[in-house]
Amino acid sequence: MEKKAAKREMFEKRLALRKRSHHAGCMFNRQPAVSGLNFRFDDSGKLRGEFECGKERQGYDGMVHGGVVAAIIDASMAQCLMGHDIVAYTADLSVRYRRPVTIDTPIVIITSVLQSRSEYLYMLESEICQNAELAVKATGKFVRPKLIAV
């Protein structure tokens, strides 16, 4: 159990360091970008967040704007990589909306690194669930430019 806690702590420390050094101006690093959004790692390196969006993030009546959902997914993927000590940029983001994400209802996002195709290309996956049902599934490709010092 101590090893798992140490692993989670390692991911959290890496994320905090990378956010300060490479991501300080990101709107998702300021509080509150989305009210209550707080990412945490599990011992396997998956990033998990729980939050709610109110009317200020609404698109169609009663639904969270799809662009807000995509931005949250993008931020979670970037921060998941930072927790793995990787600074990379979004090259491709594919978002599949399976059902509406409703306002004023708890939302859970889980993001994981699927694979690394090289030291410069990373594949990630995110799932957003609401009421224990999958609402949004996304995949992303992130590229680490050769010019970034990590």
Where are the language model's segments positioned?
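Non-catalytic linker/capping segments at the edges of enzyme domains
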Residues: 1-55
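A conserved, well-ordered hydrophobic junction motif at loop->secondary-structure transitions
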Residues: 48-72
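Hydrophobic residues in beta-strands and at strand termini
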Residues: 51-53, 97, 144
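Short beta-strand micro-motifs enriched in acidic
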Residues: 40-42, 112-116
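Hydrophobic beta-strand-centered segment that forms part of the acyl-chain substrate-binding groove
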Residues: 75-113, 142
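Beta-strand secondary-structure signal
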Residues: 48-50, 94, 108-110, 123-125, ...
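HotDog/MaoC-like acyl-thioester-processing domains
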Residues: 1-16, 101-103, 114-150
